[in-house]
């Protein structure tokens, strides 16, 4: 019979993810080792393997949680806009503000999502649900869902300006403006994420 998880198991996994995300952002996913992550966590490599069986498992859990968070943020922002009776442009502004606030607190996770999805396995994994999908495809599908949601918000906000031929370019231009803020917009700097939004 398997031993039950301790009450702090999930808290420790969360802490590992925070530290691993920082290691991946600082050194890159390929360069960061399980030994370095364990050292940064103040634990042994063996103890780290108690929580995650591989570096890729850490990366997947990090991206799995983060992409779920982004999708939840979209749903929450949409519900808030409806409850407050915001017009479509104000709702888009709220969505952009919500993304930027999330990016401010999740910069290292965002770096991993932008740079490291390619390192996830493309082998189908039956543990990820039905239909069977690979870890990489699951994360890419969620990224596509985020992009599609923002495209819909843009089309609602600017119905006369967005159409089938330009919506992808305009959506990606918006993401280009906000996705890379972590490279130049610093918390505590002369302009805040909230002011930028």
Regions of interest found by a model, annotated:
Residues 4, 11, 15, 19, ...:
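Helix-turn-helix
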Residues 93, 164-175, 194-197:
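Short, well-structured alpha-helical segments
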Residues 103-134, 183-184:
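Amphipathic alpha-helical segments used for helix-helix packing
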Residues 64-70:
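Short, basic, alpha-helical segments at the C-terminal edge of helix-turn-helix-like DNA-binding modules
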Residues 26-30, 106, 160:
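Short coil/turn segments at alpha/beta junctions that flank glycine-rich nucleotide-binding fingerprints
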Residues 75, 123-159, 168-172:
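Amphipathic alpha-helical packing segments from all-alpha helical-bundle domains
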Residues 61, 75-108:
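Hydrophobic alpha-helical connector segments
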Residues 101-105, 109, 152, 156, ...:
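Amphipathic C-terminal alpha-helical segment
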């Amino acid at each position: 019979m398997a031993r039950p998880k301790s009450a702090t198991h999930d808290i420790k996994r969360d802490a590992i993810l925070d530290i691993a995300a920082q290691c991946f952002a600082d050194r890159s996913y390929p360069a960061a080792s399980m030994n370095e992550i364990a050292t940064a966590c103040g634990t042994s490599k063996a103890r780290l393997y108690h929580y995650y069986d591989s570096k890729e498992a850490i990366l997947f859990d990090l991206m799995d949680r983060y992409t779920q968070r982004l999708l939840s943020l979209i749903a929450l922002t949409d519900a808030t806009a409806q409850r407050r009776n915001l017009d479509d442009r104000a709702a888009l502004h709220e969505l952009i503000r919500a993304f930027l606030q999330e990016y401010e607190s999740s910069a290292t996770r965002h770096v991993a999502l932008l740079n490291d999805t390619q390192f996830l396995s493309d082998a189908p994994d039956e543990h990820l649900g039905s239909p069977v999908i690979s870890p990489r495809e699951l994360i890419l599908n969620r990224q596509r869902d985020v992009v599609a949601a923002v495209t819909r918000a843009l089309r609602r906000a600017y119905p006369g300006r967005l159409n089938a031929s330009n919506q992808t370019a305009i959506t990606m231009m918006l993401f280009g403006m906000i996705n890379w803020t972590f490279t130049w917009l610093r918390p505590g700097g002369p302009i805040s994420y909230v002011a930028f939004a």
